[in-house]
Regions:
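DNA-contacting interfaces and partner/effector-binding or oligomerization modules
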Residues: 1-58, 62
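Short, charged, surface-exposed hinge/linker loops at domain edges
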Residues: 3, 44-102, 106-108, 112-119, ...
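Proteins with a high burden of low-complexity, intrinsically disordered sequence enriched in S/T/G/P/A and R
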Residues: 19-20, 86-88, 128
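Hydrophobic micro-packing sites on short alpha-helices
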Residues: 38, 119-123
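Residue cluster at the C-terminal edge of the helix-turn-helix DNA-binding motif
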Residues: 125, 129-132
Length: 137
């Protein structure tokens, strides 16, 4: 089964999902206030795009027209951090990741994009917090 990679980020007031590639005949994008909502909106936008292109006579690979694909969501740090607002504090993420809290704020707002090493530190820190919470009985 083929995969369509969908990038999800946070921008201003919404989550943004987009995918592009020659096999899609363009760019598909969607926005929503919630992470689950943007995934649903993206699926709807993708179906709308495919149906419209087929009506116009555009060609797609067989795996797309046969619905033989799955969406692989790649959550950018901005969307990940924003989705955790109200659950984890930025100071706790900063403490376990070793990254300055102000820098975490820049990543959460989408004003800055972390290098791959910084992204890994943030994700490892979030995993550490979740393991610590799972030990509470």
């Amino acid at each position: 089964m083929e995969k369509i990679k969908v990038s999800i980020s946070w921008s201003g007031d919404n989550y943004c999902a987009n995918a592009q590639g020659d096999y899609l005949n363009g760019i598909i994008a969607a926005t929503h206030k919630t992470l689950e909502g943007v995934k649903q909106e993206f699926q709807s936008a993708l179906q709308f795009h495919i149906e419209g292109c087929l009506e116009d006579g555009d060609k797609f690979p067989e795996w797309i027209t046969d619905d033989n694909y799955e969406l692989e969501y790649i959550t950018e740090v901005s969307a990940l951090l924003h989705s955790l607002d109200g659950i984890l504090t930025r100071s706790s993420i900063a403490r376990v990741s070793g990254i300055n809290e102000r820098q975490i704020g820049h990543y959460a707002s989408g004003h800055r994009t972390p290098r791959p090493q910084q992204r890994e530190k943030i994700i490892n820190g979030i995993h550490k917090i979740s393991r610590d919470l799972a030990m509470v009985m």
